[in-house]
């Protein structure tokens, strides 16, 4: 099963995350299938590759709870329904 999850990057106490598509059995920071975006919780900055995310969701990828809330804020699910 393909999951959309956060991959941790950065130094101690200066964490940022990349939103990636990865196999559900692989490690959190393992090799992803595809990088789909970036999220920095300290500055609340988010950059998303919307067409790639919509394509992965249509293929059946399951987002984690945190990624789902980020996608909901960016209104990705409305684009998926259209």
From Swiss-Prot:
SUPFAM superfamilies in UniProt: Ribosomal protein S16 (SSF54565)
Disulfide bonds: none
Keyword Ribonucleoprotein carried by entry: yes
GO BP, sorted A to Z: translation
Keywords per UniProt: Ribonucleoprotein, Ribosomal protein
Superkingdom, taxonomy of origin: Bacteria
Keyword check for Transmembrane helix: no
InterPro entries recorded: Ribosomal_bS16, Ribosomal_bS16_CS, Ribosomal_bS16_dom_sf
One cellular-component annotation, GO: cytoplasm
GO MF, one example: structural constituent of ribosome
Pfam families: Ribosomal_S16 (PF00886)
Similarity comment: family membership: Belongs to the bacterial ribosomal protein bS16 family.
NCBIfam families named in the record: S16 (TIGR00002)
Protein name: Small ribosomal subunit protein bS16
Source organism per UniProt: Synechococcus elongatus (strain ATCC 33912 / PCC 7942 / FACHB-805) (Anacystis nidulans R2)
Lineage of the organism: Bacteria, Bacillati, Cyanobacteriota, Cyanophyceae, Synechococcales
Gene: rpsP
């Amino acid at each position: 099963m393909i999951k959309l999850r956060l991959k941790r990057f950065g130094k101690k106490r200066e964490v940022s995350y990349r939103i990636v598509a990865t196999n559900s059995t692989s490690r959190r920071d393992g090799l992803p299938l595809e990088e789909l975006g970036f999220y920095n919780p300290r500055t609340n900055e988010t950059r998303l590759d919307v067409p790639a995310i919509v394509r992965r969701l249509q293929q059946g990828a399951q987002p984690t709870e945190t990624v789902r809330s980020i996608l909901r804020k960016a209104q990705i699910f409305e684009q998926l329904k259209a």
